[in-house]
């Protein structure tokens, strides 16, 4: 019986080592070069109405030309992507209202979180929206909800080769 304890301990340590190494998998650490597919948090995941949820993580997203950014939307947010050259200070923010709706230079606009879900969608507040970036450039991404943008909910997608 005394021989079983060290044997079981050794098996447990080996199993834990295999489990930990499989969790790491392939981390694709290639020195920060852009990838073809990137996943981004759009909303901090708190699903609250406060500024703590008004984040896009990371703030600068790197993707290869012809790549896709998958925005994991958490909460009441709407993605607006602008053509290269548009800056946060260029956004025409109305003095009041729920949404900004600046269509000048708009490249992509996501699902509206307001009202009932569109046909075929079960939930427009917690979802994944994938955006294809066919050309190089620095694209501005904002939350189209006025107060969220004013709280700093924007980021950039840098498309490179």
Residue ranges and their predicted role:
Residues 1-9:
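Bacterial N-terminal signal peptides that target proteins for export
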Residues 20-24:
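Sec/Tat signal peptide C-region and signal peptidase I cleavage site
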Residues 25-161:
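Extracytoplasmic copper-binding redox domains, predominantly the cupredoxin/blue-copper superfamily
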């Amino acid at each position: 019986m005394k021989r079983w304890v060290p044997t079981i301990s050794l098996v447990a340590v080996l199993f834990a080592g295999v489990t930990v190494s499989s969790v790491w998998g392939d981390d694709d650490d290639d020195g920060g070069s852009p990838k073809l597919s990137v996943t981004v948090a759009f909303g901090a995941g708190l699903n609250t109405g406060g500024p703590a949820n008004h984040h896009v993580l990371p703030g600068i997203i790197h993707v290869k030309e012809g790549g896709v950014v998958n925005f994991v939307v958490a909460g009441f947010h709407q993605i607006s992507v602008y053509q290269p050259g548009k800056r946060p200070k260029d956004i025409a923010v109305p003095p009041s209202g729920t949404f900004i709706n600046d269509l000048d230079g708009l490249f992509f606009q996501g699902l509206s979180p307001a009202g009932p879900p569109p046909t075929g969608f079960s939930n427009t507040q917690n979802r994944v929206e994938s955006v294809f970036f066919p050309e190089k450039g620095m694209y501005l991404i904002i939350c189209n909800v006025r107060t969220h943008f004013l709280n700093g909910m924007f980021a950039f997608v840098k498309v490179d080769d």
